[in-house]
């Protein structure tokens, strides 16, 4: 009968709709799970950035990551999990392992430069005083080779100090 056929077609159509809804729900759950993982990584990297005061030395990178993090949260709240994941991954890309290693290297170099400068600041005045003493006592006349060597070394040290090559 026609009624039976319509019922069968309606049931089939309803089953297709239900299957499509279940598939959409499954895909949404997968996207949410991926966004959750990406956000967790991004949050970890933002925490690292905050603990290491990245905002002070890398202001633009920090700003870009902060904007992306907020965007990830907003997209997540709107259940746009793909965009949320994308924005969270942007944060992770900005504060990547390579970036973290570069920050550590930059800071180690800066710390070493400060140590080298402190050492130079301690010895340079003494060396200058000794050169003044040598000049006042006319050491160049009696010990010209030693004086010339010391004078050349002092000039090199002054030039190195001016260009922040303190360990030279």
Describe every region a protein language model picked out.
Residues 1-168:
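Long, charged/polar, soluble alpha-helical segments
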